Amino acid sequence: MSSLVTPQHAEELSTGARQLGVELSAEHHEKLLGYLALLIKWNKAYNLTAVRDPDEMVSRHLLDSLSVMSFIHNERDNWLDVGSGGGMPGIPLAILHPHKRVTVLDANGKKTRFLTQVKMELKLDNLTVIHSRVEAFQPAQPFDGIISRAFSSMENFTNWTRHLGDTGTQWLAMKGLHPADELVALPADFTVESEQALTVPGCQGQRHLLILRRKA
């Protein structure tokens, strides 16, 4: 274990994952802590996250990412984390689901350099890092799932990514407060499939997940 990661961090991750109903193997646990160590190290120079205190990163980044894993369905194999930033939730998704293809996209070169380093050091062969504005990204095929965490408004999230999915794609928007005001401006061809209030161990404040689809 890196000297940047403490036994308390390891215990908080294990306990929080159990509370979320997420089963972590020893390899999952090791790689998530390895990711945490890289995040702590690189954040000092690269400003990857506004969370400066390493003791807050387990709950606010790792467990927050794990809180949506039960909504990542097995039949959906090709995922995009748009506006990934420091890699949440894309890196935890790639760690927990090594047989799924996960793409993390960000327009900030420093952040994509960090994500590339994470891919190399943790040997995440299922991870693809893309340095691009989302509107300019042209994948070879639609994604099965598109997820974002505090990326933009619901209107922008759906409009900017509509060309990256189709009517079979699920869009997952991770939000803090319920975005009722944003849903009013949701494009007419998108519909909310479900809404979930999430409880993240160690995190204060509201968390919500909205799952959307495009109408046929």
Swiss-Prot record:
Annotated binding of S-adenosyl-L-methionine, by residue: G83, M88, V134, E135, R149
Protein keywords: Cytoplasm, Methyltransferase, rRNA processing, S-adenosyl-L-methionine, Transferase
Chief localization: cytoplasm
Signal peptide, first to last residue: none
Family annotation (CDD domains): AdoMet_MTases
Name of the top EC class for this enzyme: transferase
EC number in record: 2.1.1.170
Reaction catalysis annotation: guanosine(527) in 16S rRNA + S-adenosyl-L-methionine = N(7)-methylguanosine(527) in 16S rRNA + S-adenosyl-L-homocysteine
GO CC, one annotated term: cytosol
Pfam families: GidB (PF02527)
Molecular functions per Gene Ontology: rRNA (guanine-N7-)-methyltransferase activity
UniProt xrefs under InterPro entries: rRNA_ssu_MeTfrase_G (IPR003682), SAM-dependent_MTases_sf (IPR029063)
Gene3D superfamilies recorded: Vaccinia Virus protein VP39
Localization of this protein: Cytoplasm
Function noted in UniProt: Specifically methylates the N7 position of guanine in position 527 of 16S rRNA.
Record HAMAP family: 16SrRNA_methyltr_G
Family the entry assigns: Belongs to the methyltransferase superfamily. RNA methyltransferase RsmG family.
This protein's name: Ribosomal RNA small subunit methyltransferase G
Native organism: Pseudomonas putida (strain GB-1)
Organism placement in taxonomy: Bacteria, Pseudomonadati, Pseudomonadota, Gammaproteobacteria, Pseudomonadales
